[in-house]
């Protein structure tokens, strides 16, 4: 089925910027954080002090204007101040498989947006295989790191950035 924003409009493919607003945790928005000795922040986090947060775009190479739950997607920050804007999943200590940003993207991304309760969740499909893993939140250093946490997804609503 079609992925909808907070106004009930279809989320558009490779167009518009969207806030991911947490359903459960009240306030907080997407941000980037440095981990270890990274030269620039590359870890995607939900930061309670950062609202409404960075905006993302959903992209599929399919020639279709809207995003559906069955589509494999690239997710990227827009507008981005750095070359690294595309989401990927990589090992990160101690969170495990964490969402990071990279400057390279495959044509078809490894994520899907799927309905969950009051909102949506992001599901990571390694190698775009059959089995998906929920992207959840791992709490550390007053931030919530987006990481694989199967069965405990981060549930959010999708608000178009122009609907202030």
Curated annotation (Swiss-Prot):
Pfam families, per the entry: Kunitz_legume
Q: Organism's domain of life?
A: Eukaryota
The site (Reactive bond for elastase) lies at: 63-64
Keyword Heme annotated = no
Q: Which GO terms describe its molecular function?
A: serine-type endopeptidase inhibitor activity
Name the UniProt key words of this record, in alphabetical order: Protease inhibitor, Serine protease inhibitor
Entry function: Inhibitor of trypsin and human plasma kallikrein with a Ki of 2.9 nM and 14.0 nM, respectively. Does not inhibit chymotrypsin, porcine pancreatic elastas, human neutrophil elastase, coagulation factor Xa, human thrombin, porcine pancreatic kallikrein or plasmin.
PANTHER family from the entry? KUNITZ TRYPSIN INHIBITOR 2 (PTHR33107), KUNITZ TRYPSIN INHIBITOR 5 (PTHR33107:SF5)
Q: Belongs to which family?
A: Belongs to the leguminous Kunitz-type inhibitor family.
What protein name does the entry list?
Answer: Kunitz-type trypsin inhibitor BrTI
